[in-house]
């Protein structure tokens, strides 16, 4: 499935070459941490594929911002909750790229607050479809484009290690991501492909909108050494570093980026 922006800009992007630049795909890049990551990678001169599910206007704005700064980007649409979503996104990425993908950031994810007593099966399955199945099979489908020096970054969460609130199902998906980081890093190391994870704490995004209130900030500060609310850029800069050559000797690690939460 392709978004309208991808269709309108793909031909123009094909006319450009980026032999010296890295190529990157960031899932869930229309807003939040994904948006900030796409912009950070573009500042490193990467050609960025901006994935979105339904937020076409927001994805278009990210692409426009990158292009206005002299960078290269296109938007790709895919519903990663669907069984064929990762395959569709990989197919669109292959069409947009020149046979090479250097950076994959599996950022797209959904969250849900529900107690063990109240979690519906359908919602549980959707959480695992988007947060675990999608990055697994997207990685599988894109591996033929990734060679030595490529980097994969999977998004985990502080919640995988630190029980907070009624997020057991969501936290379980992020625990699965932690496991995938280790296994992928071991399996792909012989190919020269690095795999790492980033585990944010509470970040000022739509997913954690409660921190935009005084009460929400106070709740966070009680658990956090650094007394401010994290912004998406705080996480994106770490992701961009892990994707860069500066992190060439780091693989299989999960970096906790949480301002010193629960030290």
Regions found by a protein language model. Give the residues of each.
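Substrate-binding pocket helix/loop in short-chain dehydrogenase/reductase
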Residues: 115-116, 120-128, 220
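Residue(s) in the substrate-gating loop at a strand-loop-helix junction
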Residues: 157
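Active-site helix of classical SDR
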Residues: 139, 173, 181
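Conserved glycine-rich cofactor-binding loop
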Residues: 30-31
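Short, small/polar-rich loop/turn modules that mediate ligand/substrate recognition or access, typified
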Residues: 105, 189, 194, 250-252
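C-terminal helical subdomain
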Residues: 197, 219-250, 259
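Alpha-helical segment proximal to the catalytic Tyr-Lys
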Residues: 144, 186-190, 248
